[in-house]
From Swiss-Prot:
Pfam families, sorted: LuxS (PF02664)
NCBIfam families given in the database record: PRK02260.2-4 (NF002606), PRK02260.3-1 (NF002608)
Residues that bind Fe cation: H54, H58, C124
Class in the EC hierarchy, top level: lyase
Keyword vocabulary terms for this entry: Autoinducer synthesis, Iron, Lyase, Metal-binding, Quorum sensing
Enzymatic reactions: S-(5-deoxy-D-ribos-5-yl)-L-homocysteine = (S)-4,5-dihydroxypentane-2,3-dione + L-homocysteine
Protein name, UniProt field: S-ribosylhomocysteine lyase
Family, as annotated: Belongs to the LuxS family.
Known EC number: 4.4.1.21
Swiss-Prot/TrEMBL GO biological process terms: quorum sensing
InterPro entries reported in the protein's UniProt record: LuxS_sf (IPR037005), Metalloenz_LuxS/M16 (IPR011249), S-ribosylhomocysteinase (IPR003815)
Cofactor note text: Binds 1 Fe cation per subunit.
Gene (UniProt): luxS
């Protein structure tokens, strides 16, 4: 079986919340795609409940695109500690951390239920499993902890 980078990462050494560059892949025509680890909570110490994580996912889909060009996808980790962010080009971890911070600030302080996209049977495959209350509480906690642009040392942006 192929080795997967995220399973090679020593999850006991990282210091969440952080943004980590996993890899930059170069396509046949020279296009670059960057893969980031947006770790919101400390692995094996906490996990965001699915309803809150699901709502954060739906909100980050738009809010990160409002703050950064070239976003391809932002998908949650199965362990519920964060997200993969895939983007064209080579944005820095600092740029991504600033965009993430701004998005979480909007979730925590501004977002209302009617702002959450994809919350009905037509636009979401599990539309009943959302919680804006949980999303706001987790966003506040992550912001209070501070988002670092480095995974192994705290360099809060």
């Amino acid at each position: 079986m192929a080795k997967v980078e995220s399973f090679e990462l020593d999850h006991t050494k990282v210091k969440a919340p952080y943004v980590r560059l996993i890899t930059v892949e170069t396509g046949n025509k020279g296009d670059k795609i960057s893969n980031f680890d947006l770790r919101l909570v400390q692995p094996n110490e906490n996990a965001i409940p699915t309803a809150g994580l699901h709502t954060i996912e739906h909100l980050l889909a738009g809010l990160l695109r409002d703050r950064m060009d070239g976003i391809i996808d932002c998908s949650p980790f199965g362990c519920r500690t964060g997200f993969h962010l895939i983007a064209w080009g080579e944005p820095t971890t600092t740029e991504v951390a600033k965009a993430l911070k701004g998005a979480l600030e909007e979730i925590a302080n501004v977002t209302k239920w009617e702002d959450v996209p994809g919350t009905d049977i037509y636009s979401c495959g599990n539309y009943r499993d959302h919680s804006l209350f949980s999303a706001k509480e987790w966003a506040k906690k992550i912001l209070d902890d501070g988002i670092s642009d480095q995974p192994f040392e705290r360099n809060v942006i």
